[in-house]
Amino acid sequence: MNFFSKLFNLKQNNHNRDTNSDCNNFYLNELECGLTPGQLILIDWTQKTGRNYNFPRYFKYSLQIDPESTHNQLYKLGYFTKNKTLSYLTVVELKTILSKHNLATSGKKAELITRIINNVNIDNLDIPFEFKLTKEAQNLIIEHSDYIKAYYDKDITMEDYCKEKNNISFKATFGDIKWSLLNKQAHRNTVSGDFGCLSNTRKAQGRHLEQEGNIKHALTQIIHTSLN
């Protein structure tokens, strides 16, 4: 943990708040990309994992989707391609396949996989699928990466980010919109006299400045927070 992280005492990500299952219309409505927040995050998650199983709980409790059925819907809509893969299997499982086909079972995992590919028709094997994003899905993730950043951000919510983005008349960056949100939050904390929350907001501003590479102002924020 670096110097700034220790001083700012980082908190858990927003997406880990999966205990509140109250209905939130924001997560049920489509974003400008034509997908719900849950669908967009699920596409990003699939890009990172390649899986269609072992979904995190936040898909159901925070994003309010059934990840398994939603994943299947997105596949049918052409956001994913799928191919059988040996990479998810354990060494023991790979050796079992080799043994059944009377092939040598010695070697490291990469060697075992290569041996199977060279000697066995993997289409006939009962093995997992690996999902990859189509070009359309890749472009979608790139174009709307700011929403994904907002969902995983430690200091703002995706919902607040979306509202603030829609309220800004010019084309703002993710950093601009987040800074605007934090400034408004600091103002509300000051007006209400909630200086405990204000201190936390100032720390969030410092983290943001550090992430933006603005070290000078980040240090100023640290000093300002420490003196209050």
Predicted segment positions?
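Short acidic, low-complexity intrinsically disordered linear motifs used
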Residues: 1-13, 105
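Charge-rich, solvent-exposed alpha-helical interaction surfaces
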Residues: 3-6, 97, 115, 140, ...
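Basic helix-extension-helix modules of the SAP/HeH family
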Residues: 10, 22-168
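An N-terminally focused, membrane-permeabilizing/fusogenic/translocator signature enriched
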Residues: 16-20
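Amphipathic alpha-helical repeat scaffolds of TPR domains
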Residues: 157-170, 180-184, 195-211, 219-224, ...
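Intrinsically disordered, low-complexity, charge-dense segments enriched in Lys/Arg
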Residues: 175-176
